[in-house]
């Protein structure tokens, strides 16, 4: 099967109530408690021949700049977390399955989207991806 790469981002959703007992961000991220909807674009053609490690991404909300990040944020190269995951799942006998999507981690930090907001991530030569939180 083909190994594809897509530019994308996640619209965070959190199962915790936002009050004075709200856990720290590191706990939310490590627990997967901020997982939400994955928004991704078409497969990137020729991605193996491009420098994906030093790619920048700019995040906008409703057309307004929010944050900028770099692919080096994902454990210094976006393929390192993918390799770790594949090895760990193989070691435990689970393995990766055809068609599964893997997100390598945030490059711009976590924002909590509000209903009706449209987020756009500009990945430069890898394209733009947009999603509206409903």
Describe the role of every protein-language-model region.
Residues 2-77, 118, 126-134:
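Catalytic-core "active-site belt" of small-molecule-metabolizing enzymes
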Residues 40, 82-89:
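Buried hydrophobic packing segments
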Residues 63, 87-92:
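A short beta-strand-loop-beta hairpin characteristic of the jelly-roll/cupin
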Residues 79-83, 103-105:
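Active-site scaffold segments
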Residues 90-100, 104:
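Beta-rich strand-turn-strand
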Residues 107-111, 125-128:
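Short, charged beta-turn/beta-strand-edge "cap" motif at the junction between a beta-strand
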Residues 110-120:
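Short glycine/threonine-rich loop-to-helix capping motif typified by GTGT followed
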């Amino acid at each position: 099967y083909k190994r594809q790469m897509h530019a994308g981002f996640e619209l965070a959703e959190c199962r915790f109530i936002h009050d004075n007992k709200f856990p720290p961000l590191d706990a939310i991220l490590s627990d997967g408690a901020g997982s939400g909807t994955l928004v991704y674009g078409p497969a990137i053609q020729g991605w193996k021949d491009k420098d994906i490690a030093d790619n920048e991404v700019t995040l906008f909300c409703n057309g307004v700049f929010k944050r900028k990040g770099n692919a080096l944020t994902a454990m210094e190269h976006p393929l390192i977390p993918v390799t770790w995951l594949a090895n760990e799942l193989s070691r435990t006998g689970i393995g990766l399955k055809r068609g599964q999507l893997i997100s390598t981690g945030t490059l711009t930090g976590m924002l909590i989207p509000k209903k009706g907001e449209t987020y756009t991530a500009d990945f430069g030569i890898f394209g733009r991806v947009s999603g509206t939180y409903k």
